[in-house]
């Protein structure tokens, strides 16, 4: 971590710029691609050249804003996309999660989101980068007109799906600031590193459906996840998590199907992350 901070000090001039200004400096006249399809985004994130532009100083772990550029077979510039890059070397030790595992958990959370068909987490991959292996996630432009401090308590289908997903993921850190409202009405969840603990740790600001029945579509999606845990999804998670964490995910899915209700807060531990935003 010390070497990351030392190298980061050299970028202080860049870090004082806005995200748009950082992007303009790095692009040197090139254009960031518009909205990308899922497969294209994942390919560019995995295979494109990753350039760190600046550090996002509000994050607790080393988190960088970067650009990934896919080059053609002739070496010419291709698609350029903005991303968030979180190197494993920059993860702060935590008391209740193993060291160096947060990036894998973020990628695993995206895998579950993809399997659900709900598209709740931006495209996310594991890859090498300037500071070593880590997580790269497609940068999402938010709708600045939406105040999540107001919206987070709404009874909206988008937030309700997120609450179901977080119950499957055992998300211990669903803050309001980890929800990104997009201009097309979707709400995506980011900063999903504190997921998949074996013991119950659900901490979220989305408790408005606590104890209520899951609807038929939610039950169907959770059941589909359960089926995929026996095949492709289970294999994906097995490459990113421990066997105990994969088994615990299956148990959470089974529990949701058995009770067919949103979970209740545990009175013996904090139910809301701090700070909540």
Please name every model-derived segment.
Residues 38-43, 47-54, 170, 258-270:
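Short loop/turn hinge sites at secondary-structure boundaries
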Residues 2-45:
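Juxta-kinase regulatory segment immediately upstream of eukaryotic protein kinase catalytic domains
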Residues 21, 31-36, 91-95, 142-147, ...:
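Short low-complexity stretches enriched in small and charged residues
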Residues 3-10, 98, 182-277:
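C-terminal catalytic region of ATP-dependent kinase domains
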Residues 13, 29, 173, 260-261:
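Short, flexible coil/linker elements and helix-boundary hinge sites characteristic
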Residues 43-154, 159-172, 176-177, 182-192, ...:
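Conserved ATP-binding subdomain of kinase catalytic cores across diverse folds
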């Amino acid at each position: 971590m010390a070497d990351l901070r030392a190298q980061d000090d050299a970028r202080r001039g860049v870090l004082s710029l806005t995200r748009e200004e950082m992007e303009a400096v790095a692009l040197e006249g090139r254009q960031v691609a518009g909205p990308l399809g899922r497969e294209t985004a994942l390919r560019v994130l995995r295979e494109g050249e990753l350039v760190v532009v600046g550090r996002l100083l509000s994050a607790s772990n080393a988190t960088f804003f970067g650009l990934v550029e896919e080059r053609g077979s002739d070496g010419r510039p291709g698609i350029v996309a903005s991303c968030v890059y979180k190197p494993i070397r920059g993860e702060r030790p935590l008391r209740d999660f193993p060291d160096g595992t947060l990036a894998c958990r973020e990628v695993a959370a995206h895998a579950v989101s993809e399997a659900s068909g709900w598209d709740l987490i931006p495209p996310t991959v594991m890859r090498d980068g300037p500071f070593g292996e880590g997580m790269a996630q497609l940068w999402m432009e938010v709708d600045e007109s939406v105040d999540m401090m107001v919206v987070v308590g709404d009874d909206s289908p988008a937030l309700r799906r997120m609450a179901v997903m977080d119950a499957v993921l055992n998300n211990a850190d669903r803050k309001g600031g980890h929800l990104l409202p997009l201009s097309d009405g979707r709400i995506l969840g980011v900063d999903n590193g504190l997921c998949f603990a074996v013991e119950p740790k659900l901490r979220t600001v989305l408790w408005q459906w606590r104890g209520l029945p899951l609807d038929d579509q939610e039950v169907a999606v959770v059941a589909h996840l359960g089926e995929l845990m026996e095949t492709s999804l289970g294999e994906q998670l097995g490459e990113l998590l421990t066997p105990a964490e994969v088994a615990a995910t299956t148990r959470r899915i089974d529990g949701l199907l058995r009770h067919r209700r949103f979970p209740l807060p545990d009175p013996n531990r904090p139910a809301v992350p701090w700070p909540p935003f």
